[in-house]
């Protein structure tokens, strides 16, 4: 026989499930992002991708993370130029990839909360070639809205890969971040 205490305990545990329903704001955010990203993908221009990245990505967070140990070397007067350079870098990457990986459609799956209180949203990307990719999006809360902090494709973090590229570039230039800023803003 189920006791009242057991039933109340089950209800309490069930109500704090880490998986969000389809109407959760993080899912609505990802639906808007998906629609805009697919439109950018179909157009394939750097400018269209830049608009989507500026609207939905945590540009400052991604940019700062990408500097790794060289973050203290970024001067305050370089910051906005660097952030814009990162947007351009990511936009060029996505525009280039859009030619090779033609997306037919996407599905937004469930969202859950990780140990750092970030929201992780699962998605599936369907290519025109018939291939599919699972992408896990990490969302963070910034200035009253969700922002994309990372995407993992086949288990590989895009921000981690970008960090590797940037820190390697800076390392070869003896820690001079201004050379990276100049390269990103050409």
Regions found by a protein language model. Name each.
Residues 1-12:
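N-terminal secretory signal peptides and thylakoid transit peptides that target proteins
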Residues 23-98:
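Early exported N-terminus immediately downstream of N-terminal targeting peptides
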Residues 68-71, 100-105, 168-170:
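Juxtamembrane/interface motifs at transmembrane-helix termini
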Residues 150-186:
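Low-complexity, intrinsically disordered terminal/linker segments enriched in charged
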Residues 17-21:
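Sec/Tat signal peptide C-region and signal peptidase I cleavage site
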Residues 132-160:
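Short beta-strand edge/turn micro-motifs at domain boundaries
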Residues 92-133, 183-186:
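Surface-exposed, charged secondary-structure patches
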Residues 10, 82-85, 183:
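Generic alpha-helical secondary-structure signal
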